[in-house]
Structures are given as C-alpha cells and as structure tokens.
C-alpha cells in the first residue's frame, strides 16, 4: 500500500454553518486519517500567498476575500492514495457538477462556498502542508499509528 499525505481545508462556509462534523464523516468514511488539525483565521497576506498560483485568474480577489471571511480548519490527512482519495470524496469544484455522495455534491452551496480545499498533487500537498504545519505538529503518518 502507498500511504500519502494531503492537505485539507474546511472553508469558512463549513465553520459558519456548523457542519464540520458532517464533513469529517466523509473524510473518515473514505478511509483517511486526520494526523494534524487546527482552526485558524487566514490573514489577507496568508490567503494571497497560499493561492498565489491563481493570482492572474479573475476569481482571485473573491477567493482571497472568501477565505479570509471567517475561520477555517486546516488538516493533514493520510491514507492510501490520499491525494486522489480526498479529491474523489470532495467532488467537482462546482457543486452543481459534483456527484451525490461527495462533500460538495451533498453539502456545498455554490462554486465559491464549496466547503473544502484539497491538494491536487503530491508535490503541492507537500508544499501546502509545510505552509500550515511544522513537522513536529503532524502525528504518525501510518494509519495504525506504527
């Protein structure tokens, strides 16, 4: 088995609506384990730095505005093929295109308030995890704690 780490962000809409537990149930049902987690409020500068890859895109200002509109929950998830597994459980970016049974298909309200962010590659996962967590803040990466 190939265990990987990926980053998850539960966006401000999830925190505001009080559905953190519901989102976590999808993550756990997919066989992913949370090995680091914290709630924080992103500054404008942090959000711009984190989403810098989208800086030239027309949605960048609204993305930064949304991500700084309230607290978020950042997590490191681990599991077999974690990047792909989490992207599958998140569903399509646009909730109207997301399959039922996915986080976005079941819970998201709009393309902006789409509940979650997940790393899109192993390379980005590594960078994104380091953006939010120091190595000592991440528990054992093996699902059985070994």
Swiss-Prot record:
CDD domains: NDPk_I. Transmembrane segments: none annotated. Coiled coil: none annotated. One of its GO terms (cellular component) is cytoplasm. It comes from the Bacteria. Its main location: cytoplasm. It is an enzyme of class 2 (transferase). It is found in: Cytoplasm. Major role in the synthesis of nucleoside triphosphates other than ATP. The ATP gamma phosphate is transferred to the NDP beta phosphate via a ping-pong mechanism, using a phosphorylated active-site intermediate. Pfam families: NDK. Its EC number is 2.7.4.6. GO terms for biological process: CTP biosynthetic process; GTP biosynthetic process; UTP biosynthetic process. SMART domains: NDK. The keyword Kinase applies. InterPro entries: NDK-like_dom, NDK-like_dom_sf, Nucleoside_diP_kinase, Nucleoside_diP_kinase_AS. This is Nucleoside diphosphate kinase. The active site is at 117 (pros-phosphohistidine intermediate). Its cofactor is Mg(2+).
